[in-house]
Amino acid sequence: MNPSLHNFRESLLQRLLDFLWRQWSALGVAGHARSDDPWMIDPEALLLFSTHIARHDSRLFDEILDWLHTNGSWINLQRLGTLHKEERLGDSAILAAIADLLSRESAHLKWKLLMRRVEKPESPTAELVHRLFPSIPILKEPDPVFLKHGLERGSIELRGMSQSPRPDQPATFLFKLRALFGMQARAEVMAWLLANEQGHPAEIARQTGYFRGSIQNVLNDLTASGHIGSIRIGREKTFSILRHDEWRFLLTWPNANAFPQWINWAPLFHAIQTFLDTLGKPGLDQKSENFQAIQLREALDQVTPALARAGRVHQMQATRDLRGTALIAALLSDLESLIP
């Protein structure tokens, strides 16, 4: 038997919560921000992942709600819904409840469209109502908005302490580009090209969470500006930023040597979420190591395409050829390295 799987999952969950605190604090959530990470944050992927993880920290969850109350207009709702569906990332009920809550404010009416897109058609029965925060009992009347979506939690009291994303750090680079280029795909395309210098439409579409046709149209429009060039290599047309260094005026933080890294966060978060769910299956600790390895191998098979999209599949020690203890040890080591 391998009862350490439970302890490993608890340790992994705490690392993920620390990571989420770090990322959300960099975006403006009240907390201790550490803004020296070299990558830009993907707010849609981060929010979706948080619906799955932040329910294990009620303070973090409510600080995210507070941030959305102030900054919800910076979330690309169409992209959020697409990533949720295509990457199977995040909790639908929690996402619908958040959207419902925000849509009751005049500044966030558009969130109602997201709520309708992700909510379940039928109302939850009493048997299908679940506690939002597993470790916190409900002592007073539950919040009616979350209860409507089958989630029981206490009343919500937002502190109003969240700030808008600061433009002088790598973490918020995508927000800076959205302020310059708008809330549609153009900002993501520019962010990706600045980080990677060149790419073709299919690759950029996979990395940014948009359809290829949309990306192709954006690239064609950007090319007309004279700042983006293209060249045909084989069957693919590759696009790049001309005079790349001239865009360094966007690097407005101290000691900025390079543009922030673009990480394809959504499939990476999906993979971590899947492994965490597998480790949390009831009774898994009490099963034989062979049974545990079979469960983990099934999870590995399931997320291998996502790991490939995230550019991590070749860094994995765990493979289908491993068995028993060897597979478990390799996969747990991989999970440690997947969390930045």
Residue positions per predicted region:
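A short, conserved structural fragment
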Residues: T223-G234
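Short acidic, hydrophobic short linear motifs in intrinsically disordered regions
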Residues: E197-T208
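Short amphipathic alpha-helical elements of helix-turn-helix/winged-helix folds
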Residues: E188-N196
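Catalytic or ion-translocation cores adjacent to nucleophile or general acid/base/metal-coordination motifs
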Residues: I204, N217, G226, L242-D245, ...
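Short amphipathic alpha-helical interaction segments
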Residues: G209-A224
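Short, cationic-aromatic polyanion-contact patches
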Residues: F175-R186, H200, R232-N255
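Long, low-complexity, charge-rich intrinsically disordered regions
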Residues: M1-D168, T252-P340
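Short alpha-helical segments that sit at the start of domains
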Residues: G160-E188
